[in-house]
């Protein structure tokens, strides 16, 4: 088999200096950016004045920010330092001006307007978040495409934008493959660039427990390391301390991103079960999983320790994560579904107490509903949290 391709074309696919996972590398700057090609997501309304002289971005910039926008001013300074050739003294001012202001007439809390003029840029937002998203749009215009190099000029334009949805989430799973803390932080500015506003941390699964719980130190001491997934003969280990997570939450807040922790239940809990087998119906210790798939090891809804354990875990999480949301998982609860509860005396006693007359697995889902109802009531009444779940979970209190 002979591969036919232009001579030298393989060089186009080599990793250039400065390459990373988030953007490609372009060696030469574009002269004038094309807003319609470089803005992701597409703004709600964009008008480009192609006949007017474009904004030449190289120069000394002056930033004028309204009260309450100190964080956004810092981001503006960072963007200009990273993207613009001449920026020797941003505070002293110069030929170009960036104005950051609030506009209460805008309809949505995350709405903003951006006007590019020949001598500068005006960004207005309903709130500081709106101003921030305007800055992220300006950053994309400065890049001109997906590169670090950027453009020499931006056409004069008027842009109005607001989110199509208010939950724009990225999920990161440090359980299957642990993500070191500094690498986790690297996701944040790239999320913000595309106006994602929620980082869903999948902290618990069959393969690892990755968040420090001071009430239960054995969780991270014994359940945060294992051999690699699916015959990868390399150790996987690591967890986040509470101090790291508090720092991470504060770091994300600067990018208007909230962090939502997830604690799976009743399935995907083998890591915890490996340390505390009394969480299950059988009370038998099981090893941490080193493969994907669905485990039939579940938390026992008829066991008082299950609720004691979850209550203590959520008490500490509520103190770390100020987000209004906590994710409770709920997916893939056993294979066959919830079958281990069929033969559990505690679960059968709970069924009888709840007036469930079947003894087979046909109504075991009602026990899952009972488990979630108790946890949801705890989260809402004591910690004022709103629960989130995977799509297959459907109970009236959710």
Question: Regions from the language model: what does each represent?
Answer:
Residues 106-325:
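Feature activates predominantly on carbohydrate-active enzymes
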Residues 31-166, 358, 378-381, 388-396:
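Acidic, contiguous N-terminal accessory segments
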Residues 11-14, 73, 209-211, 268-271, ...:
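Extracytoplasmic/secreted cell-surface and envelope-processing proteins
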Residues 272, 277, 289-290, 294-398:
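Active-site neighborhood of glycoside hydrolase catalytic domains
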Residues 16, 83, 251, 255, ...:
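Alpha-helical structural signal in soluble globular domains
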Residues 1-31:
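Solvent-exposed loop and capping/linker segments of extracellular ligand-binding repeat ectodomains
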Residues 11-14, 70-74, 107-108, 177-180:
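Short, solvent-exposed loop/turn elements at domain surfaces
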């Amino acid at each position: 088999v002979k591969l036919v391709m232009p001579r030298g074309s393989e060089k186009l696919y080599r990793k250039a200096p400065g390459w990373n996972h988030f953007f490609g590398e372009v060696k030469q700057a574009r002269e004038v950016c094309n807003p319609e090609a470089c803005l992701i997501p597409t703004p709600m309304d964009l008008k480009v004045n192609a006949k007017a002289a474009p904004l030449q971005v190289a120069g000394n910039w002056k930033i004028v920010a309204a009260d309450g926008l100190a964080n956004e001013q810092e981001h503006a300074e960072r963007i200009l330092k990273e993207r613009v050739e001449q920026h020797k003294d941003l505070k002293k001012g110069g030929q170009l001006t960036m104005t950051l202001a609030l506009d209460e007439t805008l309809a949505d809390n995350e709405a903003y307007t951006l006007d590019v003029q020949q001598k500068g840029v005006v960004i207005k937002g309903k709130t500081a978040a709106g101003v921030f998203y305007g800055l992220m749009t300006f950053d994309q215009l400065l890049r001109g495409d997906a590169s670090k190099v950027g453009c020499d000029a931006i056409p004069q334009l008027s842009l109005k934008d607001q989110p199509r949805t208010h939950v724009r989430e990225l999920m990161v799973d440090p359980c299957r493959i642990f993500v070191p803390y500094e690498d986790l932080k690297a996701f944040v500015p790239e999320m913000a660039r595309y106006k994602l506003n929620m980082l869903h941390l999948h902290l618990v699964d069959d393969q690892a427990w990755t968040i420090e719980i001071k009430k239960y130190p054995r969780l991270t001491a014994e359940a945060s390391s294992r051999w690699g997934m699916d015959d990868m003969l390399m150790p996987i280990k690591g967890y986040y301390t509470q101090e790291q997570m508090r720092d991470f939450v504060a770091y994300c807040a600067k990018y208007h991103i909230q962090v939502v922790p997830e604690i799976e239940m009743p399935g995907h809990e083998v890591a915890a079960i490996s340390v505390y087998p009394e969480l299950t119906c059988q009370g038998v210790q099981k090893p941490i999983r080193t493969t994907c798939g669905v485990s039939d090891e579940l938390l026992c809804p008829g066991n008082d320790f299950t609720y004691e354990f979850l209550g203590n875990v959520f008490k500490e999480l509520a103190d770390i994560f100020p987000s209004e949301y906590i994710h409770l998982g709920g997916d893939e609860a056993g294979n066959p579904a919830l079958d281990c509860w069929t033969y559990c005396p505690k679960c059968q006693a709970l069924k009888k107490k709840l007036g469930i007359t079947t003894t087979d697995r046909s109504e075991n889902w009602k026990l899952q509903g009972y488990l979630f109802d108790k946890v949801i009531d705890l989260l809402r009444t004591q910690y004022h949290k709103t629960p989130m779940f995977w799509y297959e979970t459907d109970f009236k209190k959710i």
